[in-house]
Swiss-Prot record:
UniProt-listed PANTHER family: PROTEIN FYV4, MITOCHONDRIAL, SMALL RIBOSOMAL SUBUNIT PROTEIN MS41
GO biological process: mitochondrial translation
Extra facts: Present with 2630 molecules/cell in log phase SD medium.
Gene: FYV4
Name of this protein: Small ribosomal subunit protein mS41
Similarity remark: Belongs to the mitochondrion-specific ribosomal protein mS41 family.
Length: 130
C-alpha cells in the first residue's frame, strides 16, 4: 500500500516522465541568424581558424546543422575531438553574442611545463657546461 503523503505526488511524477524529451527542444529557439560578418557556415569556419574550414562539407553548408549538432553527431561524422570541442565552444560563443575569433594553439616551451621547468633548466645547464 502506498502511503497517502506520496500518492498525491505520484501522478505528477508519471506525468513529467512521460512528457516529450527535453533534447528535442534543446536548440529550437537558440539558433541565431547569420550576421553580415558571418553570413554562412563556410565564413564561420574560416573565421574561427585552426583548419576548421576543411569541415565545410561535413556541415553541408547548412546553418541549422552547425547549431543543432552536438559532439556525438560530430564524432559520427569523423571530426576529431580537438576540433569538435573547439567548434562547439565557438558556436556557444556566437550563440551568446560573444565575439568569435581564432584562438591559436599553445606552444610548448623548450624546457617543459611550469611544474618541472626548474629541474629541466638545471639539467640542461649542467649538460652544456661540460
Amino acid at each position: 500500500m502506498i502511503p497517502s503523503r506520496i500518492s498525491h505526488k505520484f501522478p505528477l511524477f508519471l506525468r513529467s516522465s512521460l512528457a516529450a524529451p527535453k533534447a528535442a527542444y534543446r536548440f529550437s529557439s537558440t539558433i541565431p541568424k547569420p550576421s553580415d560578418q558571418v553570413p554562412d557556415v563556410d565564413a564561420f569556419l574560416n573565421k574561427i581558424g585552426r583548419n576548421c574550414n576543411e569541415l565545410k562539407d561535413t556541415f553541408e553548408n547548412n546553418w541549422n546543422n552547425l547549431f543543432q549538432w552536438d559532439s556525438k553527431i560530430l564524432k559520427e561524422k569523423g571530426v576529431n575531438i580537438q576540433q569538435r570541442k573547439y567548434i562547439l565552444k565557438q558556436v556557444h560563443n556566437y550563440r551568446n553574442n560573444r565575439p568569435i575569433h581564432e584562438i591559436k594553439l599553445g606552444k610548448k616551451s623548450f624546457f617543459g611545463g611550469e611544474r618541472k621547468r626548474k629541474a629541466f633548466t638545471a639539467k640542461w645547464k649542467a649538460e652544456n657546461k661540460q
